[in-house]
Amino acid sequence: MTARSRLCPLLAASVGALLLCAAEAPATAAPHSYTIVIDKLKFGPVPAQLHKGDTIMWVNKDLFRHSATAADHSFDVDLMPGKAGKTVLTKSGSIPFVCRYHPNMRGLLQVK
């Protein structure tokens, strides 16, 4: 048996092991940024595909001061008229949020 014939099975096994490891590694998506506009005493549409690590930019286009405040206190962004602020989503799950100044303004983030 030549050295080459002994190396072929070893090389094939190594490549197979690498492919198996790559197939089992979880895919992690790069974080995304989304914008939620506040206007006319309402939060704009909430993005549907939120993931842990994503950023939400809150933009207040209203004439009034607003906040985006999570019920679980995981974020609290205070926004003067015409200003913006951001939140990085640090956990998964359903996160209800409200405006502290206008409690009828509510929303729900679904974070995977």
PLM region spans:
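Extracytoplasmic copper-binding redox domains, predominantly the cupredoxin/blue-copper superfamily
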Residues: 2-11, 18-112
